[in-house]
């Protein structure tokens, strides 16, 4: 059995823009992480302020830190991703899930619904499988992770199978048509309490490269003679960019979500660019969303947010919750 995850740091001890339940508030405790996860030691350095850190421009260092954090806080003992795939910052991913938990708690008398009765759809699960891993460990939710990339799905499947207790909680499915998001993916009898998505950020490969160069410049690592590794800043094409970028992808998701209004209680998506919010609100109005929530998030100097929407009114959502309580959990064959 995986070890018991360690509790989050008390907000009183470490003021932080991260969610109060986030286990990564404050600075990483590198001495403690190294004691329990010695492989991380090779990548720990002193930053210009004399504090322990890693070189966040080094893909292997970022992977080593993620492995240690996932093992330390979530009991994930085996985790890896193929070269060139997105290596996400754990704290920000956890914040999205905690924000979604708060959204559900607001409709459950202030109590977060936990356990396998609650189902979540992850659009673009990626090779890292990060949202299902954290969401299941924190709240016991079950996940369906979807992706258009067979290599990413194979990586996510390997992570699930390598860690005891995950196979019954995390299922994976390929979206065979990149032109669609929900259509052709969801079966008519499936229902999800939440959907989540970290959409492609850029509109083209060239824009993605410019974004990577900008991040390297901010880290003081930009060298025009070096080829930029994409690992910790982006990944494969579908992870990095799509025609029209984030705004177009989210608009397409909103339009298509209306066709599945009765199968997902709350849809959601990250929106990294503040400038994309007005277009998302307009798309939601056109689609006929009954309620829209914009939840701000922050990690360090980075400001972000997610937007959540539902096509169900209060009475329909109340009926949804009652049906979930009455309906026994049903297992289906693995995808």
From Swiss-Prot:
Source organism superkingdom: Bacteria
Predominant subcellular localization, coarse grouping: cytoplasm
Keywords assigned by UniProt, alphabetized: Cytoplasm, Methyltransferase, rRNA processing, S-adenosyl-L-methionine, Transferase
Catalytic activity: adenosine(1618) in 23S rRNA + S-adenosyl-L-methionine = N(6)-methyladenosine(1618) in 23S rRNA + S-adenosyl-L-homocysteine + H(+)
Gene Ontology molecular function terms on file: 23S rRNA (adenine(1618)-N(6))-methyltransferase activity
Its job: Specifically methylates the adenine in position 1618 of 23S rRNA.
Protein name, UniProt field: Ribosomal RNA large subunit methyltransferase F
Species in which this protein is naturally found: Azotobacter vinelandii (strain DJ / ATCC BAA-1303)
Upper classification of the organism: Bacteria, Pseudomonadati, Pseudomonadota, Gammaproteobacteria, Pseudomonadales
């Amino acid at each position: 059995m995986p070890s018991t995850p360690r509790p989050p740091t008390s907000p009183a001890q470490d003021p932080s823009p991260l969610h109060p339940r986030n286990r990564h508030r404050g600075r990483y405790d590198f001495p403690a992480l190294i004691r329990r996860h010695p492989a991380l030691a090779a990548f720990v350095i002193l930053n210009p302020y004399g504090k322990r850190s890693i070189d966040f421009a080094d893909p292997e260092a970022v992977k080593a830190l993620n492995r240690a954090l996932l093992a330390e806080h979530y009991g994930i003992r085996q985790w890896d991703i193929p070269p060139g795939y997105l290596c996400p910052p754990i704290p920000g991913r956890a914040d999205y899930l905690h924000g979604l938990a708060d959204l559900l708690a607001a409709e459950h008398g202030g109590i977060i619904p936990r356990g396998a009765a609650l189902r979540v759809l992850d659009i673009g699960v990626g090779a890292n499988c990060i949202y299902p891993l954290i969401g299941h460990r924190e709240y016991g939710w079950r996940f369906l992770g979807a992706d258009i990339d067979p290599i990413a799905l194979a990586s996510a499947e390997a992570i699930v199978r390598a860690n005891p207790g995950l196979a019954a909680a995390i299922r994976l499915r390929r979206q065979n048509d990149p032109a669609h998001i929900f259509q052709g993916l969801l079966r008519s009898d499936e229902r999800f309490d939440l959907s989540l998505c970290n959409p492609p950020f850029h509109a083209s490969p060239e824009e993605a490269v410019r974004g990577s160069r900008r991040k390297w410049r901010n880290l003081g690592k930009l060298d025009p003679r070096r080829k930029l590794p994409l690992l910790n800043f982006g990944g494969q094409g579908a992870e990095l960019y799509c025609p029209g970028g984030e705004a177009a992808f989210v608009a397409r998701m909103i339009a298509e979500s209306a066709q599945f209004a009765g199968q997902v209680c709350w849809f959601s998506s990250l929106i990294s660019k503040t400038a994309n919010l007005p277009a998302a609100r307009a798309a939601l109005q056109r689609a006929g969303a009954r309620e829209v929530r914009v939840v701000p998030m922050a990690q360090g100097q980075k400001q972000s947010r997610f937007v959540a929407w539902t096509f169900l009114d209060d009475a329909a959502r109340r009926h949804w919750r009652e049906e979930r309580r009455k309906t026994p959990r049903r297992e289906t064959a693995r995808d």
